Amino acid sequence: MTIEHLVGSAHFPDVVRLTLTLDAEYELDARLGAGSFGAVYRARALTLPASAPVYHAVKAIRKDPSRPDSVETVRREAMLHTRVTDIPGVVNVHGVWEDDEHVYIMLNYCAGGELYDWIEEDEFQGDDKHVRDIFVQILDAVRACHKKAVYHRDLKPENILCNEDGTKVYIADFGLVTDRKRSIRFGVGSAAYMSPGMSRSPDQCIGGEYNHTAYLTRSSDIWALGIILVNLIAGRNPWRTARLEDRQFWRFLGSIDEETNFWEHLGVSEELAVMLDRVFEMEPEMRLSIEEMREEVLSIRAFFAPQPVDTDPEKAVWRVACPLDASLGLHESEFLHGH
């Protein structure tokens, strides 16, 4: 079996025994994620003894001959990810290679898996210190990326990886990255984490982004950071999508007008609720900056409300759910035009 056969197939095995030669020989021994255009594998360096294995992650992306610009999309991902690879909270890029069929990106292997899984296991529930420590790491990494004009556009728990004990986190999956401060590419990313102006074309947007012909990529990342913070506290998303037809998002907008606390039913403290209202500001330039978010997060005494979470079905919310294979498919099949 060759890497071409493996990555180009419709189904990817969970565990493989396949040698791939890049800068050295590696054995691909586990599939970490897969989509229609690529797969991510755990790779063990064969130059080192099996008794003391050293692992990396290899992202293998199939070139689409029917869409020549898909190759440039992948190259842009690799180039911009490499630009920020020295940032402590970003998954390191160790090398990029190409053959006739694929582009390969070698990355740090993070043994703790996705932040999503830690949230699903309620690892943060009631632990203010853990929430603060992890979220400040995320803020610092994204802020450092922005300083280098790298805007992620797909921040979510599935794209944040953890070390083995869950004390360190790293931004990953730069498939939708851009270096442009404004973007006219709408509808990229994951719906629950998109800002209102990012999810739709300008004539369909709401709030301060209504008449804009482009959205601010920095502000859209800030919106996604706010959703991630809610995930850490509640283990849920506050709404499915930031659109008027979404019942929960409509309730949130109404709570601002009525000066009521939308966040109470998610078990969020009053201190944090005040901050979240400022993060989810409809006018993108009025949202808290990452620096302001960091200052607020460090000053908040408690993230969790003292009372139990409301279980009223009328206030139902949704579990975090956006699998990796869907993300890979979007990156390589849909995000091919515009930045």
Question: Language-model segments: which ranges?
Answer:
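Protein kinase glycine-rich loop
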Residues: 29-36, 40
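Juxta-kinase regulatory segment immediately upstream of eukaryotic protein kinase catalytic domains
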Residues: 1-21, 29
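Glycine-rich ATP phosphate-binding loop
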Residues: 39-63
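Activation segment signature within eukaryotic-like protein kinase domains
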Residues: 134-135
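Conserved short submotifs of the Hanks-type protein kinase catalytic core
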Residues: 100-114, 118
